[in-house]
Regions:
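Short intrinsically disordered, low-complexity coil segments enriched in acidic
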Residues: 2, 17-20
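Periplasmic c-type cytochrome electron-transfer domains
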Residues: 20-457
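Bacterial N-terminal signal peptides that target proteins for export
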Residues: 1-9
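Bacterial N-terminal signal peptides
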Residues: 8-17
C-alpha cells in the first residue's frame, strides 16, 4: 500500500471536505465532520483527511492490520498467534470490506463469516454467560492441521414462511434453524444455549463511543410510545475491573472499542492480548491446551494501536437524495410508525480524547444503543449480562443504503435472516410490534417511500 502523502495534499483535501460539509444540508452529514462522500465498495473504510500526516498514515496502517493474515506459530508467512482454535485468519475474513459477514444460502454450506455463541445456564464470575464446559464461548471450526481439530461445523437450514400485507401482497420470510455437526469434543447437551451472529460493519464506531453514558441513560429514562421501553446493558469492563454501560455488539456486551476488538481477536482468531491473556481451550480439549503458542500477549501494540485508531476514525457515508420528495415522505412515515422511538435519528458526541475532532459532533446514526425486547421470533433464549434472550441492541441504520454495494448482499438482523430491509421490518416484534403492524397496513406507495428513505441512509 502506497503511503506517500504530503502535508499540503492532506490539507487541501481537508479544505475540500470542510467545504463539502459547509455546502451540504446537515441532515445528509450522517457522521458530522466524519462524513464521507464515497459511495463505492470502499465506502465503509474511509476517514477524514487529518491535517497531520501521522494520523492519516496511522489509519492506513490500521487497515493493513485489519487485512493482516494471522497464522499458527512457526509458519513462515503472516503474524504468529492465531489459534489453536479460530474462525478466521484476519479481521477482513469476516468484516468484508469493513462491512458485514454473509450467511450461507444453502443448507449444505457451512458458516464461514459469522459465528455461533454457546453457553449453559448461569453466569460466570463477571456476570456474563457461563461458557460451555466442552466448547467455551463459541464454536470454532478451524484448528491446527494434524495437531488440533476444529470443534465442529455449523450449517443453517432455512424454512420459508409467507407474510401478507393488508393490500394482499405477500412476502416470504426465511427462518433459520442451526445444525451443528462433526462435534469433536463430545456432545453439547440439552441445556446448551446458542446464538448465531453475523459480523457488523465497522463504520462510525468512534462516534458511537464518543456519545456520553449520560445520553444513553437519559434515552433509557425518557417516556416512549406504544409500550416501547429500552434499557442499557451493564457489562464487565476488563480494563477498569468494574461494571459499565455496554454499547458494542448485537447485545451491547462491550463497553468500549478496545475491549470489543480484543474480545474479537480472542474469540474469533484465538489471539491473546492484555485483556484476554489465555487461549480459548477448554479443560477437555487436551490437544488444544498442549499446542505450541506464540509469546504472550500475541496481539501487540504494533498491530493493536493502528487497528484501534482505524476503527475509531472510520467515517460514515453521507446520505443520498435526502431532499427527494418521496424520501422526505418516507422519513415522515418512519417517525409516524414509531421507528424513530428506538432508531433515534440524532445524537451528539461529548469530549472524545482519542480523536478530539470527534468531540461535540451532531451525528445521525439512527440508534439509541439501548436494548429492546424484539419479540419471541427473534429471541436466541440466551441471556448476556442484563440482556435477555429477546433483547437486542438497536442497530445503527447509517450506511444501510450502501450495504449491497459494499458487501454484495443485504442480509440483515443479528443472524442475517432478513434478505431485505422490508423483511427486517417484518421480523420486528415485542416492543416494535406497533411499528410492524403499521408497516403491514401501509399502502404499497407508502411502503415504497419508507424503504426509499431507509435506502438513503
Amino acid at each position: 500500500m502506497i503511503k506517500q502523502l504530503s502535508i499540503s495534499a492532506i490539507a487541501a483535501t481537508l479544505s475540500s471536505a470542510l467545504a463539502f460539509a459547509a455546502d451540504t444540508e446537515s441532515e445528509s452529514l450522517s457522521g458530522g465532520l466524519f462524513t464521507t462522500t464515497m459511495r463505492d465498495a470502499a465506502a465503509y473504510r474511509q476517514t477524514i483527511p487529518f491535517p497531520d500526516e501521522k494520523r492519516q498514515l496511522q489509519h492506513l496502517d490500521g487497515f493493513d492490520s485489519l487485512a493482516q493474515k494471522w497464522v499458527m506459530p512457526l509458519l513462515p508467512t503472516g503474524v504468529w498467534g492465531r489459534g489453536p482454535l479460530s474462525n478466521a485468519e484476519s479481521c477482513l475474513g469476516c468484516h468484508i470490506n469493513s462491512g458485514r459477514g454473509t450467511v450461507p444460502a444453502k443448507s449444505n454450506e457451512p458458516i464461514r463469516t459469522m459465528l455461533v455463541r454457546v453457553s449453559v445456564p448461569g453466569k460466570n464470575a463477571n456476570g456474563g454467560p457461563m461458557p460451555h464446559p466442552r466448547y467455551g464461548d463459541q464454536i470454532n471450526f478451524m484448528g491446527v492441521e494434524h495437531e488440533v481439530r476444529g470443534e465442529a461445523e455449523v450449517f443453517i437450514d432455512w424454512r420459508e414462511k409467507p407474510v401478507q400485507f393488508a393490500d394482499g401482497e405477500t412476502v416470504s420470510l426465511r427462518e433459520p434453524k442451526l445444525r451443528i455437526e462433526q462435534l469433536v469434543y463430545g456432545p453439547l447437551g440439552d441445556d446448551t444455549l446458542f446464538s448465531p451472529r453475523v459480523t457488523q460493519p465497522l463504520l462510525g464506531l468512534g462516534l458511537l463511543e464518543a456519545v456520553p453514558d449520560s445520553t444513553l441513560e437519559a434515552l433509557s429514562a425518557a417516556p416512549k410510545p406504544h409500550g416501547i421501553k429500552g434499557k442499557t446493558n451493564r457489562v464487565w469492563d476488563f480494563a477498569a475491573k468494574r461494571m459499565a454501560i455496554g454499547r458494542f455488539g448485537h447485545k451491547a456486551t462491550n463497553p468500549n472499542l478496545s475491549q470489543q476488538i480484543m474480545a474479537a481477536f480472542h474469540d474469533d482468531m484465538g489471539v491473546t492480548s492484555n485483556l484476554f491473556p489465555t487461549e480459548t481451550c477448554t479443560d477437555v480439549q487436551k490437544s488444544c491446551r498442549n499446542a505450541f503458542s506464540a509469546p504472550q500477549p500475541e496481539l501487540g501494540p504494533n498491530q493493536f494501536v493502528p487497528l484501534l485508531f482505524y476503527v475509531q476514525a472510520n467515517a460514515v457515508p453521507a446520505r443520498r437524495n435526502a431532499g427527494d420528495v418521496d424520501v422526505k415522505r418516507g422519513e415522515k412515515l418512519f417517525t409516524e410508525a414509531a421507528c424513530a422511538a428506538c432508531h433515534t435519528p440524532e445524537l451528539k458526541t461529548g469530549e472524545y480524547a482519542p480523536i478530539p475532532e470527534m468531540s461535540h459532533q451532531v451525528i445521525r446514526p439512527f440508534t439509541d444503543l439501548l436494548l429492546h425486547d424484539m419479540g419471541e421470533a427473534l429471541s436466541d433464549n440466551r441471556p448476556d449480562f442484563e440482556a435477555g434472550g429477546r433483547e437486542w441492541r438497536t442497530a445503527p441504520l447509517w450506511g444501510l443504503g450502501l450495504a449491497k454495494t459494499v458487501n454484495g448482499h443485504t442480509d440483515l438482523l443479528h443472524d442475517g435472516r432478513a434478505r431485505t430491509t422490508a423483511e427486517a421490518i417484518l421480523w420486528h416484534g415485542g416492543e416494535a410490534n406497533f411499528s410492524r403492524e403499521v408497516f403491514l397496513k401501509m399502502p404499497k406507495a407508502d411502503r415504497q417511500a419508507l424503504l426509499l428513505f431507509l435506502d438513503s441512509l
